[in-house]
Amino acid sequence: MKKKMVAAVLTAVMALGMVSGVTVYADADSKTLVVGFDAEYPPFGYMNDEGEYVGFDLDLAEKVCENLGWELVKTPINWDSKDTELNSGNIDCIWNGFTINGREDDYTWSEAYLNNEQVMVVKADSGIETLEDLAGKNVVVQTASAALDALNSDDNKDLTASFASLTENPDYNTAFMNIDSGAADAVAVDIGVAKYQLAQREEGKYVILDEPIQSEQYGIGFKKGNEELRDTVWAEILKLYEAGEVEKLAEEYEVADMLCIGDDEDADADAAETTEEAAEDTTEETTEDTAEETTEDAEAAEADAE
């Protein structure tokens, strides 16, 4: 059902492209797509042991560019400077576990493709089991991250106020080093990053608290107003999803349970199906009631005749 709905959306996107008569390139001459990303944000973007930039988002961007015949330029950026990089034209998009929620009006967004949660990671022997247990504790978070935004939101102001301290680190590798050393008691982080970091460390040494800080979704952020590039890239992602390539990549990087492409269409389809079933039930009940009334009327008429 999900892929059928995605196919319908893909057809509509392609039709819009045909109507406009425009083929969009990040760079009309060299046909490049310059993707800005945090180079220390596994499993979405990072440097592997061979010195290559890889990750779910970067590999997906690579496949999109292969389909379009473009060159992908992977550009590591200081996450705190991402808006400057985008608005100055140094990069074409921010594609790296980038949270939509709370930034809806700041970028031209793709559709959401991954569900995400902001969570807390603590040492297993810390005695911290709930968010309430973080009262009086030292918490670290990445600068300019969605986790920081979540902690500063009105929904979590009481939680954040309970901390002994909230310290911003330049990246999550530094944040986890602070947990390792005991300089911090907990790190607020995206669930995908948390799972990756725990998999790289001693088994059972760290745990993710059950209660999330915030639920959200990832999208690709383009410069405000750049709908044509957004639509071109998203159309290719839908094709890759239809071909099973997105799910394959997600499984490779262990984020398959976060995929949400087509979820809105599924919800609409389920709602339509429920409405249709309800209408059928109502029709059946009305038919049955009418039949019963007709039978009763006939019996009454027969009795009167006798």
Language-model segments: what does each one mean?
Residues 24-53, 66, 127-138, 202, ...:
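Immediate post-signal peptide segment of exported/extracytoplasmic ligand-binding proteins
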